[in-house]
């Protein structure tokens, strides 16, 4: 899962800090979630999905996180 999130984030040219800001969490917290140490909350998954779609990546939430 984590490699997919990182891959899509890199594909759209965003940093971990930018995604952390999008989610309203610290960069450290985001890094732990992307590394699979902590889980993303449902609302965070939805925000990431919406941002990727806004940036032209047309995929489902399950393709990103599962």
Residue ranges and their predicted role:
Residues 6, 17, 62:
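Residues within the helices of the helix-turn-helix
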Residues 1-11:
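A short, Lys/Arg-rich alpha-helix, primarily the initiator
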Residues 4, 15, 41-44:
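Residues that mark the N-terminal boundary/hinge immediately upstream of a DNA-recognition element
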Residues 6, 31-32, 49:
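Key DNA-contacting residues within the recognition helix of helix-turn-helix
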Residues 9, 20, 49:
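The alpha-helix within a helix-turn-helix
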Residues 41-61:
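DNA major-groove recognition helix of helix-turn-helix/homeodomain DNA-binding modules
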Residues 14-32:
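Short alpha-helical DNA-recognition segment
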């Amino acid at each position: 899962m984590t490699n997919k999130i990182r891959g899509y984030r890199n594909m759209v040219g965003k940093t971990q800090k930018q995604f952390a800001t999008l989610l309203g969490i610290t960069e450290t917290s985001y890094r732990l979630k992307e590394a699979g140490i902590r889980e993303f909350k449902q609302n965070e998954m939805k925000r990431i999905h919406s941002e990727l779609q806004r940036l032209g990546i047309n995929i489902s939430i399950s393709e990103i996180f599962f």
